[in-house]
Amino acid sequence: MTEGHGDDIYRYDDIRINFSSNVYTHADLSKLQDHLREVIYLIRNYPEPEPFTLEAIIARKQGVPADCVLVTSGATEAIYLIARTFALQQESFSASILHPTFSEYEDACRMYGIPTLSDNDANAHSILWLCNPNNPTGSVVSPEKIQQYAQQFDYVVVDQSYEDYTQAPMLTPQDVVSSDNILQLHSLTKTYAIPGLRIGYIIAPSHLIGLLRQYMGPWTVNTLAIEACKWLMENDVRVLPDLNTYLTETERLRQRLNQIPGIKAAETQTNFFLAQIKPYTAAELKDYLARSHHILIRDASNFRGLTPHHFRISTQTSQENDLLVNAIEEFMQRKKTFPTWE
């Protein structure tokens, strides 16, 4: 559902502060840009048909065998690859999805004819899709609970794209490769704040990685994405802010929003969170912020299970966060009608 995602900055003429994307927007990528200028000549040649050199680096960094790693063009390609692979392997197959969550799990299943269940019960040849930390709620499922799911379902896909934005315990790559039915998705896009390069990877037991390779086309990951991540990982580059400071600021922003009559911001374990506005809609608020304050938020009403009143916020700098709060206060004051939250 490509038109249903956030970060639709292209729809507006002059967005100056972007709260819509969960990717950190203030990363200093200047040294990476310098490196890419040095290797730009590589675009004259085809990339590796399968990026084995980067997979070897990832395997070494994560402490797993290289045949347990598969690099993809972002975590989204991994989602569709997994759905395609299992759809072609099994005649009777269904998926369970914990809503609200990232829409691509359901979209990928629909594309390949995998029925999705309305509840979370396991059945024959079942796969559970789990976003952890979850987008859009920011909640985290414990490793112990995931292991329980692995006993209940034939396969469990754990999308850890936002793992670098939480302090909660995560399922480790070692836990995954020692299982026989867990697939773990990682997003280098999120880790290094490079969404335009589209790169991620899967960690899974070697027999599952081997199966996925059979259904993956050649040259799906471009040269610059491969070279960027090789350089970033080999040089142990970190572009995200201090996580403790970042999450403290997230909580400050959430509390400030909760002081506005008509706004209710939910708890979170990461840098983004859901909020509700009543009696107005998220679409009204989004349009006002974009056109009057050059601020972009995520209208979350298209997440299954949410309402037209839900929106999502991703923490920015303290100054930018205060500008958002002031702009929302202004919107509510202009409307001058506030609900009573129960």
Q: What is each PLM-predicted segment?
A:
Residues 29, 50, 181-259, 263-266:
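PLP-dependent aminotransferase class I/II
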Residues 117-169:
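Active-site phosphate-binding strand-loop segment of PLP-dependent enzymes
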Residues 53-94, 112:
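Phosphate-binding glycine-rich loop
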